[in-house]
Amino acid sequence: MKVVKFGGSSLASAGQLEKVLNIVKSDKERRFVVVSAPGKRNAEDTKVTDALIKYYRDYVAGNDISASQSWIIDRYAAMVSELGLKPAVLEKISKSIRALATLPIEDNEFLYDTFLAAGENNNAKLIAAYFNQNGIDARYVHPREAGIVVTSEPGNARIIPSSYDKIEGLADSNQVLVIPGFFGVTKENQICTFSRGGSDITGSIIAAGVKADLYENFTDVDGIFAAHPGIIHQPHSIPELTYREMRELAYAGFSVLHDEALLPAYRGKIPLVIKNTNNPDHPGTRIVLEHSSDKFPVVGIAGDSGFVSINMSKYLMNREVGFGRKALQILEDLNIGWEHMPTGIDDLSIILRGRELTPIKEEEILRQLVQKAEVDHVEIEHDLSIIMIVGEKMKSHIGVTATATRALSENKINIQMMSQGSSEVSIMFVVNKDQEKAAIKALYHAFFDESKED
């Protein structure tokens, strides 16, 4: 029994939907289909979700909504026409889109989510109708019926654990169930969305709920690459990752899969595979609990920019009980989150994302660290990047760190800081932002096929 999720690029046009139909038809185990809203048909096109955002803004601002409404309805109309679906399918979708502009604006914290969810919801109706017209016994299932009950946090909903009891009942159906992704319903029956890209989360929730044998996530790439294709020309694809490795890579900039989507499948011990709708025979990248082999110590190199470091020093810092707590309390009081905290005997650095800071907050941090923590020296360093070498099997291979530092040194890349967690799933290097790409290239060629030059 498999749960299949298709992203927006896989559902952008009638031609893409034909591929989806064939994929579902080719395997009778694909019994649950989770869908996104239609994505871009080409680089100049607009995603339906973005069009719904414009529609919402026009509506709440009291602007003319006719153009926004018409564009969205016409987008679905084109697919209905090209797929040869019955007019009643478009009538239902059109009615749903127009009904959004009758909802109350005042005291309606879920209005924005309701608008956004319409993209997935109406696409699921269309796809269920298309399946039924082409030999698949399918049924559209609203998240309310599916049992996806979520917290009342607009734009950041989380599944309520008790929901899984009802979701499990979906497995009793003999039909192919088509479920819109991205949103659930609250206990008060309000539509509430996950964070953007949340259809991945829905797929993972359904997979965990029905105890699927596999969760297949179809997108527009042949799985996950060992480095960003925009930096490394034709990087290796990764055949297998663990959930822990995927989490590390997602944190450091890999955006193939919504990182929150890993949690339900991970807890449910459901293997996941990233596959390509346009190349479905490619094996893709499989995400599992444990590796089947320890042949490759490093599975991927990832980098992300926009970090800053608060660097402080104090003589005999290591003997002062509670120093770290004082420093972090200052950040907490200013509502500032942090990412990493490399330390020495008499020095400590707190790495955080630059978006957490403002000039006023920076001044306050410096002032309070001097006053409350009595540091000898403190400075804030900007424009930093984090580079992650990821691989659970690094801990059983000698010389991985030496290989990495040698590669960076030979390419004249200055390592500002380095850190490795106790789990040894990743090694983190902090470098200047202008050396990020060079660092990724150096590390990639040190651990992977050096014949693949840019």
Feature locations, PLM:
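Surface-exposed amphipathic alpha-helical tracts and adjacent flexible/coil segments at the periphery
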Residues: 257-259, 268, 278-285, 359-362
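Positions that flank functional sites
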Residues: 146-147, 222-223, 280, 346, ...
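Nucleotide/pyrophosphate-binding catalytic subdomain
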Residues: 1-258, 262, 430-432, 451
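Structural motif
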Residues: 1-2, 30-33, 137-139, 175-178, ...
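Glycine-rich beta-alpha junction loops
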Residues: 38-39, 221-223, 272, 276-281, ...
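Active-site-proximal loop/turn and secondary-structure-junction residues that shape catalytic pockets
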Residues: 37-40, 183-184, 278, 316, ...
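A conserved regulatory-domain signal marking ACT and ACT-like small-molecule sensing domains
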Residues: 283-454
